[in-house]
Regions:
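Conserved ABC transporter NBD signature motif
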Residues: 76-87, 91-92
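ABC transporter nucleotide-binding domain
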Residues: 196-298
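Catalytic Walker B motif of ABC-type/P-loop ATPase nucleotide-binding domains
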Residues: 174-178
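Conserved ABC ATPase "signature" region
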Residues: 116, 120, 127-145
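Helix-to-loop junction immediately C-terminal to a conserved catalytic motif
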Residues: 68
Length: 341
């Protein structure tokens, strides 16, 4: 059952901020010729919420599975309170609570029953378990679905139930693999509230996610994986929306776009993403420079700040019909971060 990983630690308490945590050294794992994790060394600290980000296939899930003892590394160590969890996988399952990427089916059980079963397996007595389960249901605003059969639940409610199965009982270490997938925006905030609460109680919290804005808002620190390697380990204050890219969709004449590109080429060294090249723009001008065309370009924040005054001038001059700004794809933002290293 998702979210269950052995019994609770002695006494059923969270780790204190002066003990616990994880020290990973030289962790490597290959599947055939694919290097899933490549010489990863990192210290995960009690009391912190750490986000693990990176492209699909970057090695994030493999990293979690090695911590909890589901996958054995080829090399390296994972130390917790003086014990190498690689050579003591039973201890890993005892100290770690994990929410896997795959959502539990919940066939034949309600959210209340599923969470209660998980916390009892982790060592909570009946009355303790009942109180803890109710607290989770209340915090995640699951009251309306608490006693509804699993086959009648939406994907988001099932996902929150799997999260509750992992987070409710005390554990020194919590591992979550994309817990906010399929979850509505309001309950995403409630989920992060529970993660923060566990960290404040002294637990070590590691969450895999693809939502950079949530990482910046809620996590203390982020780890960036790329091709199996840890390429960044920084406080989230260093993540900065300044690094995030945006999309500028603009309906304008090709001639105006050429002028805009010239301005950005001269005044910024930032990546212009998929801004049409000069040859492409000149071909559109040859076709008919007076016909507005829609272009969508990806720009770094500083390039966007330079572009907007010219776009507004273009509107006044009749060269720009409309524009809109949106968030660039996660892939674009990851590429920007990775290319800086």
């Amino acid at each position: 059952m998702a979210g269950i990983s052995g019994s609770a630690s002695s006494g059923g308490v969270y780790a204190t901020k002066t003990q616990g945590g994880l020290t990973v050294t030289g962790l490597s794992k290959s599947f055939g010729k694919t290097r899933a994790n490549d010489d990863i060394s990192v210290r995960l600290i009690p009391g912190e919420v750490t986000a693990l980000i990176g492209h699909n296939g970057a090695g994030k899930t493999t990293f979690l599975n090695q911590i909890v003892g589901l996958t054995r590394p080829d090399a390296g160590s994972i130390m917790h309170d003086g014990t190498d969890l690689i050579t003591h996988p039973a201890q890993a399952r005892q100290v770690c609570a994990i929410m896997p990427q795959v959502t539990s089916s919940l066939e034949g059980v309600t959210p209340r029953q599923a969470i209660a079963t998980a916390v009892r397996i982790r060592g909570l007595k009946s009355k303790q378990a009942q109180r803890a389960v109710q607290e989770t249901l209340d915090t995640l605003d699951l009251g309306d679905w608490a006693d509804r059969p699993g086959h009648k639940l939406s994907g988001g409610i099932k996902r929150l139930t799997s999260f509750g199965m992992a987070v409710t009982a005390p554990a020194p270490i919590y591992l979550f693999d994309e817990p906010t997938n399929d979850v509505d925006p309001v309950r995403r905030e409630l989920l992060w509230t529970m993660l923060r609460r566990r960290a404040e109680q002294g637990a070590t919290v590691l969450i895999v996610t693809h939502n950079l804005l949530e990482v910046e808002r809620h996590a203390d620190r982020y780890l960036l994986f790329n091709k199996g390697r840890l390429v960044r380990d920084e406080p989230t204050s260093a993540l900065g929306l300044a690094e995030a890219k945006s999309t500028l969709s603009i309906t304008a004449t090709p001639e105006f776009l050429q002028e805009l590109r010239s301005v950005l080429d001269v005044k910024t060294s930032s990546s212009l993403g998929n801004m049409p090249d000069t040859e492409y723009i000149e071909k559109r001008i040859e076709d008919d420079s007076s016909i507005p065309r829609e272009f969508t370009v990806t720009l770094s924040t500083d390039a966007l700040e330079l572009a907007l005054p010219h776009v507004l001038s273009g509107i006044r001059a009749g060269c720009v019909e409309s524009y809109r700004i949106g968030s660039a794809s996660l892939a674009d933002n990851y590429e920007e971060m990775i290319n800086h290293d």
